[in-house]
Amino acid sequence: MKGKFLKVSSLFVATLTTATLVSSPAANALSSKAMDNHPQQTQSSKQQTPKIQKGGNLKPLEQREHANVILPNNDRHQITDTTNGHYAPVTYIQVEAPTGTFIASGVVVGKDTLLTNKHVVDATHGDPHALKAFPSAINQDNYPNGGFTAEQITKYSGEGDLAIVKFSPNEQNKHIGEVVKPATMSNNAETQVNQNITVTGYPGDKPVATMWESKGKITYLKGEAMQYDLSTTGGNSGSPVFNEKNEVIGIHWGGVPNEFNGAVFINENVRNFLKQNIEDIHFANDDQPNNPDNPDNPNNPDNPNNPDEPNNPDNPNNPDNPDNGDNNNSDNPDAA
């Protein structure tokens, strides 16, 4: 389905900055030395198909002096085939805030869920319906998978700038994760410094609602903090960071001009939070036989073939097992 929406003038696009969305002067002075403990920085019933706002209704965010974090490695190119492969779940976001309409990025990771930043959802001022999502957007005239309206927001319980957004079905009763295949999350067991990565999203310095990919390398990795040498601008907030297998390893939040860009790295703590809140999120190793979370793994306690599972007929503690001394089975030599 090709959605037609009202044009947005790129001259008036209000971008969610990748440097700061908070008003405190201290937050604007983020240093790369404080990456491990940085304050958060920036860069219901069925709803009717959301509409793109007119240019005249768009207003810039205040205090956006660090909106663009363009580094010497400015390898950015447009993605025009947005509906195929790992590009399809990358999503253009508009937030209709009291002070104007702002843009950001996100990535679909479940049947009705998307990941983006806390500072993106904060722009809704507590009204989830203010956030609209357009997966696989090609440009301001072409939204091949239509639009979706948010209904619930869950912020990451840790310090990382990460949020889960749940969406209502569209007018055709389709879920956002049905019109596009949700992204695969990396288990990040092999992620390390100097690996090639990409950040894909909807930067505000490019034509409205056009998808762009930046290429670079990881330069720093510790805990939930990841830094890299590629370039982003306002509007990239919430963009997925992909590894060379096109798996999501982090969610871009912003950067420090002339120094680095950064993301929330999907480490074990973040992964556990996501699994607790998104039932159908898919991690790359979930299907592996040795993965303890795989229900087909014999060592999974929920697997009926697990020898320790009480209902396993081979379990000596199973009351139906003839070797169970408490069992009156006629085949049981200990039966009364």
Curated annotation (Swiss-Prot):
Region span, Disordered: 34-61, 283-336
Annotated EC: 3.4.21.19
Pfam families (UniProt xref): Trypsin_2
Sequence repeat residues: 289-291, 292-294, 295-297, 298-300, 301-303, 304-306, 310-312, 313-315, 316-318, 319-321, 322-324
Biased composition annotated in UniProt, kind: Low complexity: 39-51, 286-336
Catalysed conversion reaction: Preferential cleavage: Glu-|-Xaa, Asp-|-Xaa
UniProt keyword Signal, yes or no: yes
Major subcellular site: secreted
A GO molecular-function annotation: serine-type endopeptidase activity
UniProt xrefs under PROSITE patterns: V8_HIS, V8_SER
Propeptide: 30-68
Region listing for 11 X 3 AA repeats of P-[DN]-N, in residue ranges: 289-324
Signal peptide from the UniProt entry: 1-29
A single Gene Ontology CC term: extracellular region
Listed GO biological process terms: proteolysis
SUPFAM superfamilies in UniProt: Trypsin-like serine proteases (SSF50494)
Additional notes on this entry: The cascade of activation of extracellular proteases proceeds from the metalloprotease aureolysin (aur), through SspA to SspB.
Protein family membership: Belongs to the peptidase S1B family.
Name under which the protein is recorded: Glutamyl endopeptidase
Underlying gene: sspA
